[in-house]
From Swiss-Prot:
This is LHFPL tetraspan subfamily member 3 protein. It comes from Mus musculus (Mouse). It comes from the Eukaryota. It is found in: Membrane. The gene is Lhfpl3. InterPro entries: LHFPL (IPR019372).
Length: 222
């Protein structure tokens, strides 16, 4: 085999190995991110009490707990299965979009099984669109959630100065921050999926070209 052909074969082998390694990392990060998204959706620590709040407590997307001022016990309400218990329409909308994003990222993980049956590049691109839609749902959920801060229950915990997009004496908690960071993560994952899909397309084109060269050389020898 000529040195140029050996170098080309070595480059092709490394190219395939690197693409597979990056693909495995992308899949692992997607699974980890799905777990984080489920935690953000379930945990009620999006906003919480502070030093100067009238009542102790915390709010999530669909579950919240507020003290009664006379004891340390918190009264908890809210359920995703019963939207009527949510104190604001904004909380209902935010719960819907964050819940939809959770379902999309889980569906993306289920799509990993398509790698065994379908074209790899196509699966990457399907997952990329799903992750991009997932990021859009996260953006909507995170933007709509503060619109419900003017609800009576939120004001009871955070004070009368609380209003839409004004948190009053309360503070933002870790689940809300994690959801905002998740938007950037989802965009990075979708971009990486597009890159991997395009690399698979170019890889298939190179393999097809190599096969054609082999067939032509065999035909010429005959």
């Amino acid at each position: 085999m000529l040195p140029a052909q050996e170098a080309a074969k070595l480059y092709h082998t490394n190219y395939v190995r690197n693409s597979r390694a990056i693909g495995v990392l992308w899949a692992i990060f997607t699974i980890c991110f799905a777990i984080i998204n489920v935690v953000c959706f379930i945990q009620p620590y999006w906003i919480g009490d502070g030093v100067d709040t009238p009542q102790a407590g915390y709010f999530g997307l669909f579950h919240y707990c507020i003290g009664n001022g006379f004891s340390r016990e918190l009264t908890c309400r809210g359920s995703f299965t019963d939207f009527s218990t949510l104190p604001s329409g904004a909380f209902k909308a935010a719960s819907f979009f964050i819940g939809l994003s959770m379902m999309l990222i889980i569906a993306c993980i289920v799509c990993f099984t398509l790698f065994f049956f379908c074209n790899t590049a196509t699966v990457y691109k399907i997952c990329a669109w799903m992750q991009l839609t997932f990021a859009a749902c996260l953006v909507l959920g995170c933007m709509i959630f503060p619109d419900g801060w003017d609800s009576d229950e939120a004001k009871r915990m955070c004070g009368e100065k609380t209003d839409k997009y004004t948190l009053g004496a309360c503070s933002v908690r870790w689940a809300y921050i994690l959801a905002i960071i998740g938007i950037l993560d989802a965009l990075i994952l979708s971009f990486l999926a597009v890159v991997l899909g395009n690399r698979q397309d170019s890889l298939m084109a190179e393999e097809l070209k190599a096969e054609n060269k082999v067939l032509l050389s065999q035909y010429s020898l005959e």
